[in-house]
């Protein structure tokens, strides 16, 4: 049902779930900063603290901002489709740039310390996430922002784009959990099992990551919370149906 101004109102519970997701996401970032500040000495580029740039940037970029980019089409329900696309794409660009800083930080730190690269499951999953994220963005840019792709191609690719977007986000959350556990085992060793305060805080951070991922995924999978088709999108959809199925208004 549309409002008198022609705008489709958001479903009743959607704004509350979106607000809850933002509260969780900001808390994840804050707790990450608190963990690194209180127990790891903070962050810096030209010192032993350079490694700490990595988890902070990855959490902000590939978890929080990527999650927000996926929610754009649920939050902005009545704005022009192209405007929403651009915001969706720009949030992904920002997430990519921040994640790239985090990736450079950890490789540079390893080089300075003589530590081997890409031997752990966390690092393998991290590289996979980064490559998939970049590929997803580039393909999405070609299909949905540049005018070259036809409506039929966009319609056929859209389900894959939606699926891989959610899959990459969940893989990002899982990779962050692997990295968190790896860092705790390296730093605490056997003290981890003694309920050290750092370990407890990091475990809370892990639960917050899971909660943020779960709430974002729930919002994305609610079919009744999808962005409604605008008038021009409905017209294009009808034209595509006419071309592919052979029906026309006169045959109804």
Swiss-Prot record:
Keywords: Acetylation, Cytoplasmic vesicle, Electron transport, Heme, Iron, Membrane, Metal-binding, Phosphoprotein, Translocase, Transmembrane, Transmembrane helix, Transport. Its cofactor is heme b. Residues 20-221 form the Cytochrome b561 domain. GO terms for cellular component: chromaffin granule membrane; lysosomal membrane. It catalyses: monodehydro-L-ascorbate radical(out) + L-ascorbate(in) = monodehydro-L-ascorbate radical(in) + L-ascorbate(out). It comes from the Eukaryota. This is Transmembrane ascorbate-dependent reductase CYB561. It comes from Sus scrofa.
